[in-house]
Amino acid sequence: MYRLRRKRAAPKDIYPSCKISNTCPPDIQNKIEHTTIADKILQYGSLGVFLGGLGIGTARGSGGRIGYTPLGEGGGVRVATRPTPVRPTIPVETVGPSEIFPIDVVDPTGPAVIPLQDLGRDFPIPTVQVIAEIHPISDIPNIVASSTNEGESAILDVLRGNATIRTVSRTQYNNPSFTVASTSNISAGEASTSDIVFVSNGSGDRVVGEDIPLVELNLGLETDTSSVVQETAFSSSTPIAERPSFRPSRFYNRRLYEQVQVQDPRFVEQPQSMVTFDNPAFEPELDEVSIIFQRDLDALAQTPVPEFRDVVYLSKPTFSREPGGRLRVSRLGKSSTIRTRLGTAIGARTHFFYDLSSIAPEDSIELLPLGEHSQTTVISSNLGDTAFIQGETAEDDLEVISLETPQLYSEEELLDTNESVGENLQLTITNSEGEVSILDLTQSRVRPPFGTEDTSLHVYYPNSSKGTPIINPEESFTPLVIIALNNSTGDFELHPSLRKRRKRAYV
C-alpha cells in the first residue's frame, strides 16, 4: 500500500528551531550554511580560476559589471534595476574666525607696578537743575527732640496749630408714654438710650413719586363682563404667509413610481389584509415597521384587493397634505411580477395613497334649560318672609299659604277616608289606523279565603251611644285588575286571576 508523502516546512523555518538542539537534517543544514557539494566546488575552484565581476554565486542575477552577453553577439545587456533617487545635500554653514580684540603692546623695560596719576584737588562740580512743586506748610506740629543724659526726663515741645471751631447742637424731646431703661450691659451697636437724635434734611415743597388714582373694586354679586377685541388675524408676533401644501416629491415621480389611489379604509390600519388573508394569531405594529410578504410567484393566489396583486413589500406610512388640504396616508410598495432563471425578482414600484375624509362640523343640539318652570315659586325663610316668583300660571289657580299665622283645620279635613279605586273599568286599545277596540272586563269569581275576613272600618268612641245603631249594607266588592300594556305592539298580559280555569282539585 502506498503512503502519501507529507510535506514538511520550508528549510528556513526548520533551521532556527533545530539548530538550538543540534538536530537539523543534513540536507537542510548544508543548504542553509552553503556547504553542499556545489558550494564546495565553487569555493575550491575559485582559488585557481578568477571569475571576477561575473556575479556567480551571489544570487543577484545581474551578470556582474558588464552584464549578460548573448552568444555570437557583442556588447552586454544590463538588467534594469530600480533607480536610486538623488537627494540634495544639506547646506553647511561656514564657520569663520572669532572677533579679534586689539591688545596693547607691553613695554618689557617698564616697571611692574603701575603708578597712579595725580589729578589735583580742583574737581569740576556739575550743576543739576531740579524742577519740583512747592507744597504748602503742613499743619502737623514739629517735634524737636533734644539729647538727654541718663537719669533725666525727656522734654518734648509740641506746637499747637490753629484748630477749626466746630459747632455741635443737641435737641432732646421727652416722650412721657415711652421710657427707655438704661442698663449697664449695653451690647455693641445699641442705640436705644434715653436720648433720641433725629437727623433730617429739608426737601422743600417737592413731592417724590407719582399720584396714581385708585379704582374702586366692585365687591358685590354682580358679574364683571369683559370683552376681548382681536386686533390682528394672526396669533403670533411674526406672521408667516400661507405656505403651499407639502407633498413628498420623491413619491410623485411618475418615472419611478406608479400612482394608485386606494379607496378601502383598511389601508390605514390593516394593509396586510389587502394583500393576504388575515392571521388572527399575529398582529404586528404596522405604524412603525414595514411589511414584507413571503409569497411564491409560481403559485397563483387570489388577493383580497386586485390593486395589491404581486406586492411583496409595503413601507411604513407617511403622512402628507393633499392639494385640497386633507390628510393623505402614503405607502411605497414593491411588486415581484417577473422572475429570471437565476431567481432574481423584477417588479414595478408603486405609490399607494389614501385620502382621509374631512371632519364634518359638530351638529348643534338645542339643550333644554334645567331648573326653570312656569309655575309660581314660593321661597320661605326662617324669619317669616315669603317671596313669590310669578310664572305663566294665573295667581288665582294657586293657593298661598302664610307661615306667619297658623291655621286650624277641622277633624273632617284631617280624617282619612277610603276611596274606592278600580270600579267599573274598561280597556280601550287604539291601533295605528285609528280604530278603537273596547274590552269589557268581566268580574271573576273569587274564592273566599280560609278564616275570618273583616273588611269594615271600626271607629272606637270612648262614650257609649244610646239607641239602636244603623247598619248599612256592604257595597259590592269589585277586585282591582292590573293589565300591563305594550305600547309598541298593543299586546297585554292578563292578571293571573283572569286566566283560563283548569280542572284542579283545591285542598
Swiss-Prot record:
A GO term for molecular function: structural molecule activity
Tree of life domain: Viruses
Name used for this protein in its record: Minor capsid protein L2
Family annotation (HAMAP family): PPV_L2
Motif annotated as Nuclear localization signal, chain positions: 1-9, 500-506
UniProt source species: Human papillomavirus type 1 (Human papillomavirus type 1a)
Cysteine disulfide partners in this protein: 18-24
GO cellular-component term (any): host cell
Origin organism lineage: Viruses, Monodnaviria, Shotokuvirae, Cossaviricota, Papovaviricetes
Subunit comment: Interacts with major capsid protein L1. Interacts with E2; this interaction inhibits E2 transcriptional activity but not the DNA replication function E2. Interacts with host GADD45GIP1. Interacts with host HSPA8; this interaction is required for L2 nuclear translocation. Interacts with host importins KPNB2 and KPNB3. Forms a complex with importin alpha2-beta1 heterodimers via interaction with the importin alpha2 adapter. Interacts with host DYNLT1; this interaction is essential for virus intracellular transport during entry.
